[in-house]
Amino acid sequence: MNEELPELPPEAFLKEDTSADPLFYAQPRFVTHIDESAIAAVTELYRVLFPAGGTVLDLMGSWVAHLPPEVDYAEVIGHGMNEEELKANPRYTRYFLLDLNANPVLPLADASIDAAAICVSVQYLQHPVAVFREVRRVLKPGGVFAITFSNRCFPTKAVAIWLHLPMGQHSRLVSLYLDRAGFALIEPRVVIPPGLPEDPLWAVIGRA
């Protein structure tokens, strides 16, 4: 399934729920998937990494983008699987619907965005290197890609390798995706360590 990752077993990107992803996401979910402390940490990460006045791509997004409210961007492009959720996001200047597991090609021009994000959704990608390679294509040289994740997911839709790896190993997996997609200066971070009352949060950052 993933020729770019031959060291992983062939079943690494299978899912328990094999139904089409658009069916699973057909009903809008106006909820957040991490607690307020983790959301604040994501926002602070974006505040530091994403340039004001730039163009931001929020991949696998929903009705909230966790971008710093005081920062103005030239454009925030949303992507997701449920139009009601995307339409409700006040930060999106435009959005597109796309099942990345069926088609990883982004409908965006080469070198057209300054920053990209995936927040608590990377575990659902069945062709992560192909998607990350597309992100690198649309990023301007030196553009930043921030992937954040916690210990929560829809388990029937997460890929097998994500469910089987210990929490601390997910950063290595995402770093591998970035490396195979051609990103440079890959930096894993423990943003909120596990064992605290708050939701844990990890980030992996790559530069195009």
Where in this protein do the model-derived segments appear?
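Core SAM-dependent methyltransferase catalytic element
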Residues: 181-184, 191-208
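Class I SAM-dependent methyltransferase Rossmann-like catalytic core
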Residues: 2-51
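A short SAM/SAH-binding and catalytic strip from SAM-dependent methyltransferases
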Residues: 114-129
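A short glycine-rich, Lys/Arg-flanked "PGG" loop and its adjoining helix->strand segment in the class I
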Residues: 129-144
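Conserved class I S-adenosyl-L-methionine
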Residues: 144-175
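Short alpha-helix
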Residues: 41, 165-188
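Class I SAM-dependent methyltransferase SAM/SAH-binding core
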Residues: 41-44, 48-107
